[in-house]
């Protein structure tokens, strides 16, 4: 059984037992979370979501992604600026997919 959920402005296909990386959400490690915006379950498409459907998961890890470097450069102006950014994420294990 699979489902497509919407979280963090993205649509993600999930299956039971799968571990996914999503945009950071509030919560501690081992907290249970429920995703209510379910767009599809096993081919059944919602309009726009499926009422009463839920995907339950457990937070495994809160972390930051690999650092990226952004360089601002103006030729002939002697202006060079380097910025760094690490995007926070939440790793979630999908425990249950339920359609009502």
UniProtKB/Swiss-Prot annotation:
Alphabetical list of InterPro entries matching this protein: bL21-like (IPR028909), bL21-like_sf (IPR036164), Ribosomal_bL21 (IPR001787), Ribosomal_bL21_CS (IPR018258)
GO cellular component: cytoplasm; ribonucleoprotein complex; ribosome
Superkingdom of origin: Bacteria
An example Gene Ontology molecular-function term: rRNA binding
Keywords: Ribonucleoprotein, Ribosomal protein, RNA-binding, rRNA-binding
GO annotation, biological process: translation
Cleaved signal peptide residues: none
PANTHER family in the cross-refs: 50S RIBOSOMAL PROTEIN L21 (PTHR21349), LARGE RIBOSOMAL SUBUNIT PROTEIN BL21M (PTHR21349:SF0)
Complex and partners: Part of the 50S ribosomal subunit. Contacts protein L20.
UniProt function note: This protein binds to 23S rRNA in the presence of protein L20.
Family under the similarity heading: Belongs to the bacterial ribosomal protein bL21 family.
Protein name listed in UniProt: Large ribosomal subunit protein bL21
The organism of origin for this protein: Mycoplasma mycoides subsp. mycoides SC (strain CCUG 32753 / NCTC 10114 / PG1)
Lineage per the UniProt record: Bacteria, Bacillati, Mycoplasmatota, Mollicutes, Mycoplasmataceae
Gene: rplU
């Amino acid at each position: 059984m699979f489902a497509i959920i919407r979280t963090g402005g993205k649509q993600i296909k999930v299956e039971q037992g799968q571990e996914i990386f999503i945009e950071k959400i509030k919560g501690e490690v081992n907290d249970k979370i429920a995703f209510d915006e379910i767009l599809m379950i096993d081919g059944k498409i919602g309009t726009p979501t499926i009422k009463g459907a839920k995907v339950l998961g457990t937070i495994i890890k809160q972390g930051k992604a690999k650092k990226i470097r952004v360089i601002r450069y103006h030729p002939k102006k002697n202006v060079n600026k380097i910025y760094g950014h690490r995007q926070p994420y939440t790793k979630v294990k999908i425990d249950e997919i339920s359609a009502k």
